[in-house]
Amino acid sequence: MNDTLALLQKFNAHPDSRCWYVAWNPKGTLLASCGGDRTIRIWGREGDSWECKTVLQDGHQRTVRKVAWSPCGNYLASASFDATTCIWKKKNDDFECLTVLEGHENEVKCVAWAPSGNLLATCSRDKSVWIWEVDEENEYECVSVVNSHTQDVKHVVWHPTQELLASCSYDNNVCVYKEEDDDWECRATLEGHTSTVWGLTFDPSGQRLASCSDDCTVKIWKECQPEGGQEGTDAAWKCVCTLSGFHGRTVYDIAWCPLTGALATACGDDGVRVFKEDETADPDQPAFSLSAHVPKAHTQDVNCIAWHPKEAGLLVSCSDNGEIAVWNYQSGV
């Protein structure tokens, strides 16, 4: 390992609470965090450090599990254990709650915007994935409810350029969805993990998907076009690589750097790891090596990892101990 992962700053973001998730706005000027204290905190850079700019605390009655910025950066969505999703509008340095999306029967575990900004996906412990459409008046309408998982759905993520959605679940599977005749349906089920799948990330091209699991592995799935290339036939997703033996406990989150292609993981063994792809390997049989590892990045489980969208190598992680850590990853090659 010639590469380094250096700590730039660590701060107590959600005191006496878990910090569940962190998300950069599209420009990378703001970082949103959420936690068990029912708050969302917005962080901005002041010189070399990150300072809390505002606290959103009136939206939810229970833990806020995930936050997601709209592609334009003017809206923030928050998913909560109170079974609702709040949509916040940025107004100068402040945020106001525009609307509350209701319908899930249990905790909402994740929320994600499509690259167009016109669609939003939510998922829940009620085993369902909901697709919401956003109109010009900022009205949100549920256009599809998909029940393709048999257990709690942990995470949803959109393809970087297409209206293609993936979800993962306590049922050990990953589902890939597309719209068909005005309805969304599961077009592929990716089976291979032997325990809960916690997180998903597309590579910058959208041709590959990485999943992380309670089985302590990371799997890389590649989109394979059907033979003969018939029109209307769905692409299949094939597992082309499994990273095993690197993580000591559950891998809770995974992030593919949009700038460098490095893959970072957040783990229940308190560690943060970065993997690098062997560029000489066959694309159909990719190989990844562990390039940097901080064994005790936090004193408790690491819940989330997020690459900065504009600065290569800048990475944040957050933990059950309420902390956020800011890292600089440098490749030795």
Swiss-Prot record:
WD repeat segments: 14-53, 59-98, 103-142, 148-187, 192-231, 246-285, 297-333
Keyword Repeat: yes
Keyword annotations of the record: Repeat, WD repeat
Disulfide-linked positions: none
GO biological process, alphabetically ordered: iron-sulfur cluster assembly; protein maturation
Assembly description: Component of the CIA complex.
Family, similarity comment: Belongs to the WD repeat CIA1 family.
Protein name: Probable cytosolic iron-sulfur protein assembly protein ciao1-B
Gene name per UniProt: ciao1b
